[in-house]
Amino acid sequence: MNKKEVRLRRARKTRAKIAELKSVRLTVFRTNSHIYAQVIDGSGSRVLAAASTVEADVRSQLPNGGNKQAAQVVGKLIAERAKAAGVEAVAFDRAGFQYHGRVKALAEAAREGGLKF
């Protein structure tokens, strides 16, 4: 198995556990140049809030979308949008990525923004 397959396998296990709980989840996806976050309802069929470094208003604030600073901006933004949608508590789905660097920065910024994990 290569690195990507291992990550996806890890992600599948995590998502299965979160699906059993039927809780709202905050899922993160990252590439070398961008980071994306979505708040998805318990059934997994509806996106309640989304934020990413691809958006024009976020891109105008940042010189680079693939660093910790960008992840913090996206974390604060997703927390604001989730609270506006009526979501206070989420399960954190890191999609198999290590809880380190940009993923950790996004999670901490979302917590500071008022989301409970």
From Swiss-Prot:
PANTHER family according to UniProt: 39S RIBOSOMAL PROTEIN L18, MITOCHONDRIAL, LARGE RIBOSOMAL SUBUNIT PROTEIN UL18M
Membership in a protein family: Belongs to the universal ribosomal protein uL18 family.
SUPFAM superfamilies for the chain: Translational machinery components
Protein source organism: Aromatoleum aromaticum (strain DSM 19018 / LMG 30748 / EbN1)
This protein's record includes keyword Cell inner membrane: no
Upper lineage: Bacteria, Pseudomonadati, Pseudomonadota, Betaproteobacteria, Rhodocyclales
Keyword list, A-Z: Ribonucleoprotein, Ribosomal protein, RNA-binding, rRNA-binding
Pfam family, one: Ribosomal_L18p
InterPro entries per the UniProt record, alphabetical: Ribosomal_uL18_bac-type (IPR004389), Ribosomal_uL18_bac/euk (IPR005484)
One GO-annotated biological process of the protein: translation
Function: This is one of the proteins that bind and probably mediate the attachment of the 5S RNA into the large ribosomal subunit, where it forms part of the central protuberance.
One example GO MF annotation: structural constituent of ribosome
Keyword Ligase (UniProt): no
Example of a GO cellular component annotation carried by this entry: cytosolic large ribosomal subunit
The protein's name: Large ribosomal subunit protein uL18
Quaternary assembly: Part of the 50S ribosomal subunit; part of the 5S rRNA/L5/L18/L25 subcomplex. Contacts the 5S and 23S rRNAs.
